[in-house]
Curated annotation (Swiss-Prot):
Gene3D superfamilies, A to Z: 3.30.300.10, 3.40.50.880, HUPs
Lineage start: Bacteria, Pseudomonadati, Pseudomonadota, Alphaproteobacteria, Acetobacterales
Pathway: Purine metabolism; GMP biosynthesis; GMP from XMP (L-Gln route): step 1/1
Name recorded for this polypeptide: GMP synthase [glutamine-hydrolyzing]
Classification via InterPro entries: Class_I_gatase-like (IPR029062), GATASE (IPR017926), GMP_synth_C (IPR001674), GMP_synth_GATase (IPR004739), GMP_synthase (IPR022955), GMPS_ATP_PPase_dom (IPR025777), NAD/GMP_synthase (IPR022310), Rossmann-like_a/b/a_fold (IPR014729)
Length: 533
């Protein structure tokens, strides 16, 4: 397959249609900036997140229909408080300032912001005093609405042209508007789920205020990305590391739809996957989709290298190194490929913002193959780099990938190895697989799987005394974990009823020889992390 002028023209036309309406989100360091982008995308509008340091030239070239200013951990009174670029208001486009974004906008345009002893953190209620385009059809004058606040500073004097349209106990200017210039500010966070109608408010901004029509769809993205892949690859060959996870599965199917047998997938089975997952990968991609697939069973190698390793970080790094080494071996056998496919997502490419001047603390190393392209002298194909995880799942459904794959709970790259605190052995893996399979089977049977962000079992490195029949046992304990979340950044424990937990625990201790005690982890994130290691 060779590139033609028609291919290039197709890419240009599809790209223009899909990205015609776009919103720019300027990031001032908020931990939830990505949630703003997800709400915008959910409204059918393409958007990008850029740091507040973006140049005027770049912002003008992007030509957004509207601009959203994020929150920030900073105060507008800090010596190095992040400023709003002057071009934001020079463009005469609609602007929505959120929390710090509202405060910085007010201060820049002639208002006043002060620290106040009455701070608002968590659930709060605002009273709607006047009608406003920002929430027309969502909230009505005279109503009280629930929102989520997180601020110490507050606006105390509005800039010329603005009016207050809502207030709360701790924020006299909870929502402000300059309808003439289409400038709006909210002291709360509409992007979080704790503001019940926040997504509708953001949709109002993108559609009713900024005039976007909602051209961003996964059907359109699929068509565009297939054309892009054909344009980039031409008649070249692509190899793709297939893990069985959502990202690599969707990337592989999308690329195969574009170039067919020019793609070869390499599936390295490390022996640390859940029950039946390795077989499902082979069955789905080789059998159902007819994708060229190299299947390497490397379980013995991984177990040998992990023997005696107890430190979680060392486990992760060992597994990551082995994946790369085995992948390189198999790729070398194939020979002749010019392109390497990766399931890079948009959160991976967003430029992070730090006000401390130093790197952020590494809580856990992320398992990826970021070192491969330079070492292998190959050009990257990253068909998912514009997408968030939830969009990848939607695209997977558009591509016809089974729900058992696209709807699967997040699973860490190091697999079950980090769900076994201490050293990893085949016996421990077999034990954990049995426990995990029973737990997930019961969750599905109860119709709860899709209501839970992530559920799994952990094999604890402790033995406990028990009684089975007339005899004493001294076997291992396991922990069950289930959380709800929207993005994995924060998580709440799932509130199973006791009857469910009792049923699961009963099955585990009766059906899994070697387990005599079951616990349920009720720790939220923070302070805990979702995974144990």
């Amino acid at each position: 397959m060779t590139l033609t002028q028609q291919d290039a023209s197709t890419v240009e036309k599809l790209d223009e249609t899909l990205h015609e309406d776009r919103i720019l989100i300027l990031d001032f360091g908020s931990q939830v900036t990505q949630l703003i982008a997800r709400r915008v995308r959910e409204s059918g509008v393409y958007c990008e997140i850029w740091p507040f340091t973006a140049t005027e030239e770049k912002i003008r070239a992007f030509n957004p229909r509207g601009i959203i200013l994020s929150g920030s951990p900073a105060s507008v009174h800090d010596e190095n408080a992040p400023p709003i670029p002057n071009v934001v208001f020079a463009l005469n486009r609609p602007v929505l300032g959120i929390c710090y974004g509202q405060q910085a906008m007010c201060q820049m345009l002639g208002g006043k912001v002060e620290s106040h002893e009455h701070r608002e953190f968590g659930r709060a209620y605002i009273d709607i005093a006047e009608d406003c385009s920002l929430f027309r059809g969502v909230w009505a004058r005279g109503k009280r609405e629930q929102v989520w606040m997180s601020h110490g500073d507050r606006v105390t004097q509005l800039p010329p042209g603005f009016r207050a349209v809502a207030h709360s106990e701790g924020a006299p200017f909870a929502i402000i508007a300059d309808e003439g210039r289409r400038l709006y500010g909210v002291q709360f966070h509409p992007e979080v789920v704790h503001t019940p109608h926040g997504a509708a408010l953001i949709r109002n901004f993108t559609h009713n205020v900024a005039g976007c029509s909602g051209t961003w769809t996964m059907a359109g993205f699929r068509e565009l990305e297939i054309a892009r892949i054909r344009k980039q690859v031409g008649s070249g060959r692509v190899i793709c590391g297939l893990s069985g996870g959502v990202d690599s599965s969707v990337a592989a199917k999308l690329i195969h739809d574009a170039i067919g047998d020019q793609l070869t997938c390499i599936f390295v089975d490390p022996g640390i996957m859940r029950t039946g997952e390795a077989d499902e990968v082979v069955k789905t991609f080789r059998g159902r989709f007819n994708i060229r697939l190299v299947h390497r069973d490397a379980s013995e190698l991984f177990l040998k290298e992990l023997a005696g390793v107890t430190d979680p970080e060392t486990k992760r790094k060992t597994i990551g190194r082995l994946f790369i080494e085995v992948f390189e071996e198999e790729a070398a056998k194939l020979g002749g490929a010019q392109f390497l496919a990766q399931g890079t997502l948009y959160p991976d490419v967003i430029e992070s913002v730090s006000f401390s001047g130093g790197p952020s603390v590494t809580i856990k190393s992320h398992h990826n193959v970021g070192g491969l392209p330079d070492r292998m002298n190959m050009e990257l194909v990253e068909p998912l780099r514009e997408l968030f995880k939830d969009e990848v799942r939607m695209l997977g459904r558009e591509l016809g990938i089974p729900e058992s794959i696209v709807g699967r709970h997040p699973f860490p790259g190091p697999g079950l190895a980090i769900r076994i605190p201490g050293d990893v052995t085949k016996e421990k893996l077999d034990l954990l697989r049995k426990v995990d399979a029973i737990y997930l089977e019961e969750i599905r049977r109860a119709g709860l799987y899709d209501a839970i962000w992530q559920a799994f079992a952990v094999l604890l490195p402790v033995r406990t005394v028990g009684v089975m029949g007339d005899g004493r046992t001294y076997d291992q304990a396991c922990a069950l974990r289930a959380v709800t979340s929207t993005d994995g950044m924060t998580a709440e424990v799932y509130p199973f009823d006791f009857a469910f937990l009792n049923r699961v625990a009963g099955r585990i201790v009766n059906e899994v020889r070697g387990i005599n005690r079951v616990t349920y982890d009720i720790t939220s994130k923070p302070p805990g992390t979702i995974e144990w290691e």
